[in-house]
């Protein structure tokens, strides 16, 4: 009996795959245990779509012993092309590391993604750890000549523009080096900017950043910031109000109104980043006298009620913050935390008392939580069919944790973490409910894949087939299921 395998969702080694070269310069292989379309595409430097098309596949499920044609394996042509490229100029070689993307590598070596793909003969954006990429050298005579003309143009134009800009920008910009656990949201709050401003200032096309990346930031003493502050101070007398809509988050609202998330928190005396549909927020004006008096009273109280809390299994900063009626940011600052990942047994200093009146607000909390879950699931389903992209966090392509990051930020503000990172920050539950997160051990031990539970054994996730709805009772998922976690 043939054993079926779910495509693209395992990373065990391909052992003994049979390869036969045909006269037409195509290759055929026989599927072995552990093979998947994604893995074969990576091994033979093609794409899942090309494999599916070449073999007229109507499903991504493979059978052991099945014969597949590998498209476009023109070894002689590729070798001659590479040798000619080497002759034209000496190429540097870069080895892909875990977490890399073409965009990151192109930025690091001051290239465009298109140049990188041309230089390496790539037909897709998929790369794998350990893969060797050429990162310098001549792509073609036409591209090199265009580069020369562009460089001549850019050198003159950039020198003009930079000289014009330097007088105003040099004094008004600083730099920030990205640290482990950082996100654009966290950095924007740290340097009192909006995420949109950070992205424009650094020409970022996505929210993905990497450790040791240097970002330009606005100096607090710049002319622009003083202008903004003066205009804001003029506006404070007329308070603007905003009613929260489905899909909103503090980050989204802050960007729309050119504010920081922290400013909205302060003005509205928010204890958490959780919003609910219909909630009215003030968007201009000073933090209310009530909030300042309450903050002063809480600081007075906290000075006498500082407690040490030991992290338990299932805890997250958000869960602990709710328990002690403080914000996650207050816990971060109090404990100098560089990341939101907590360890069981870790000691945290908390200023405040565990809330005794949680039951009175439970009905409001339940209704707002339900609304957020519905919004999140709607946002997730709207992405059905979006292709898989390693490290992707946008509708142009997602990986599993990038998909979770995207949909969670439709209803709250979270950092970009791995599947294991989200596992460590959420509360464990014995059985998943709608809106909970289900985790699986796929290509390595521990949580390496995550999806959102929809009920009736189904969950939505981004796997190698793209964003799809899968069934947990499928033999592949059933044997790899780790457990469920709750965020809301």
UniProtKB/Swiss-Prot annotation:
Active site residues per record: 400 (nucleophile), 449 (proton acceptor), 461
Transmembrane segment boundaries: none
GO cellular component terms listed in the entry, alphabetical order: extracellular region
Keywords: Cell wall, Cell wall biogenesis/degradation, Hydrolase, Protease, Repeat, Secreted, Signal, Thiol protease
Keyword Protease (UniProt): yes
UniProt note: phenotype after gene disruption: Cells from an undomesticated strain (3610) lacking this gene grow predominantly as chains, whereas wild-type cells grow as separate individuals. They do not show a reduction in the rate of swarming motility.
Annotated GO MF terms: cysteine-type peptidase activity; lytic endotransglycosylase activity
Gene3D superfamilies linked to this entry: endopeptidase domain like (from Nostoc punctiforme), LysM domain
Disordered: annotated span: 70-93, 137-176, 218-239, 286-306
Activation and inhibition: Is inhibited in vitro by para-hydroxymercuribenzoate, a sulfydryl inhibitor.
Subcellular location: Secreted, Cell wall
GO biological process: cell wall organization; proteolysis
UniProt domain LysM: residue ranges: 27-70, 92-135, 174-217, 240-283, 307-350
InterPro entries: LysM_dom, LysM_dom_sf, NLP_P60_dom, Papain-like_cys_pep_sf
Domain spans labelled NlpC/P60: 370-488
PROSITE patterns: LYSM, NLPC_P60
Function according to Swiss-Prot or TrEMBL: Cell wall hydrolase that cleaves gamma-D-glutamate-meso-diaminopimelate bonds in peptidoglycan. LytF is necessary and sufficient for vegetative daughter cell separation, and also seems to play a role in cell autolysis.
Similarity remark: Belongs to the peptidase C40 family.
PANTHER family the UniProt entry points to: LYSM DOMAIN-CONTAINING GPI-ANCHORED PROTEIN 2 (PTHR33734), MEMBRANE-BOUND LYTIC MUREIN TRANSGLYCOSYLASE D (PTHR33734:SF22)
Name of the protein described by the UniProt record: Peptidoglycan endopeptidase LytF
Species in which this protein is naturally found: Bacillus subtilis (strain 168)
